[in-house]
């Protein structure tokens, strides 16, 4: 209900685009025929819509996603510079849609809004006005989780330590206790200078989940400045079947999770001149949390010895992470010492520990 009402606040007429858009919005779309139209309407439902470039990237959908996209183009495009564009491609995964969308983006800033998500139209209108005059490499805002099953929006404020509208040097926010806490710039909160992103010359892993973590790394490598505005814009839809953040999905796709982690570790080797602040940021905000999560997946969710041993053996090649105190906790050290033969007895061991502690 929240989703549909936002897209129907007013009637949207045909929209005349501009040669140099302020914001390029890439919409990765796979089997989202039930969501795409309403989501796009929320992006266009304001007076600054003509300054936006929407790039729908259909990732080999098996439903009518392409048809919906073409209907949106017919409904709203007019003039020499279409507001809505479509890339229709074979399935290559979420990363491939961002790769292809960025290539053709012409806006001053670039961001991603998934095909089953939506935005607050009024706040997006305000953001476009801000981006017109803003020059920071990254502009961050707030977002909310849309828990559809209970029809509730849960606002997420992760940049409250920043003074709204003040430009910060990214490097200065990389130090523990002062800058970014759990998260820095992420897909749900951030607009990135388009040319900066293109100059980074990255390619997200294709046909793979969890590439948002790769994006979080690539997007800050060349960033020098960052600014925050307290506008609640993005609506992250929670509750769709098959979302990659579920326990079952983590178990099913654990090899892809490991692949992304090791891709990031290898990428760090290719940028030896990156500042210590940014390197620490990447390790603390991306690599270490992913590594801890993976030990949870292979050690607690699966409890299969070979999964644990294979991952642990491979990680040993990256000593800084392998021995990191947040990674090499008591659980991990115990199963390393015992060759992971006791993984299947985790539940029993935990119960014994609780009795002993009492």
Q: Residue locations for each model-derived region?
A:
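Glycine-rich, basic loop-to-helix element that forms the pyrophosphate-binding segment
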Residues: 88-105
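Cell-envelope/extracellular polymer assembly enzymes that use nucleotide-activated donors
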Residues: 21-24, 53, 214
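Short aromatic/hydrophobic "clamp" motif used to bind/position activated sugar donors
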Residues: 110
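N-proximal low-complexity "stem/linker" segments adjacent to membrane-targeting elements
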Residues: 1-45
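Donor-binding/catalytic cores of nucleotide-activated saccharide
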Residues: 115-226, 236-252
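Membrane-interface aromatic/basic loop that binds lipid-linked glycans or pyrophosphate carriers
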Residues: 1-5, 136, 298-358
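Acidic helix N-cap motif at the loop->helix transition within catalytic regions
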Residues: 37, 63-72, 122
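A conserved acidic beta->alpha catalytic loop
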Residues: 42, 58-68, 92-93
